[in-house]
Design a protein with these regions (language model features):
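A generic structural motif
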Residues: 34-40, 139
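Short hydrophobic segments within beta-strands
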Residues: 12-13, 42, 114
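Short connector loops at secondary-structure junctions
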Residues: 40-49, 147-153
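Glycine-rich phosphate/pyrophosphate-binding loop and the adjoining helix
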Residues: 2-10, 140-188
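N-terminal beta-loop-helix "entrance" segment that forms/cooperates
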Residues: 44-60, 156
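Helix-loop-strand module that forms the ligand-binding subsite of alpha/beta enzymes
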Residues: 58-138
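N-terminal beta1-alpha1 ligand-phosphate binding loop
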Residues: 3-36
């Protein structure tokens, strides 16, 4: 956990694509974070597909690192695309790996969710799906504000900068609310 003033957030992006709108949205969140908040990014793209036979032999090193990162963070930020009305396979795989006993590190963590998609819904269904997982794993998802970046191809420039001022304000508000939520539920 971070010091008494700041909140440490572990972020994970459910998209592996180099030019991903979700990766760009995560960069925007890092840029807009409140003073004193730190946001570290977990690398979840190298995990093998979850297999209990593998886990029974011990967590793979990148998964063990991820579990330690989750445990050390005050709060979590999920940034997810929407694939077939759900979160991405890479994000679900990371959650599946990290949630296994012993010492499931998600329990009690405050979490914020945001996402971007080319569709009008802006990842609303994926975020709902992810929220259900969060509740099952005893995380505490932040309810408001919601950040659904729809029609994302019109809101990022060629360099990947998020140009939508309303959306930038929502991301900023989400992070401020996450900081307040983390303090309110006693994680900080």
């Amino acid at each position: 956990m971070s010091d008494a003033k700041g909140i440490s957030v572990l972020a994970m992006c459910g998209s592996l694509r180099a030019g991903s709108y979700n990766r760009a949205a995560l960069r925007t969140a890092i840029e807009l974070k409140p003073p004193g908040m730190t946001i570290d990014t977990a690398d979840i793209g190298s995990f093998p597909l979850y297999n209990e036979d593998v886990r029974a032999q011990g967590f793979p090193p990148p998964v063990e690192t991820f579990r330690r990162q989750i445990a050390a963070a005050d709060a979590l930020l999920f940034v997810t695309p929407e694939y077939n009305y759900s979160m991405s396979g890479v994000l679900k795989n990371a959650i599946d790996w990290a949630s296994r006993p012993p010492d499931q590190p998600f329990a009690g963590k405050p979490v914020a969710i945001m996402g971007a998609s080319a569709g009008m819904g802006g990842t609303a269904r994926a975020q709902y799906d992810l929220r259900r997982c969060c509740v099952f794993l005893d995380m505490h998802p932040l309810n408001k504000p919601e950040v659904f970046i729809g029609v994302a191809h019109t809101k990022f420039d060629a360099e990947g900068s998020f140009t939508d001022e309303v959306g930038r304000g929502l991301i900023r508000d989400l992070l401020v609310a996450l900081e307040q939520w983390t303090r309110q539920i006693g994680r900080k």
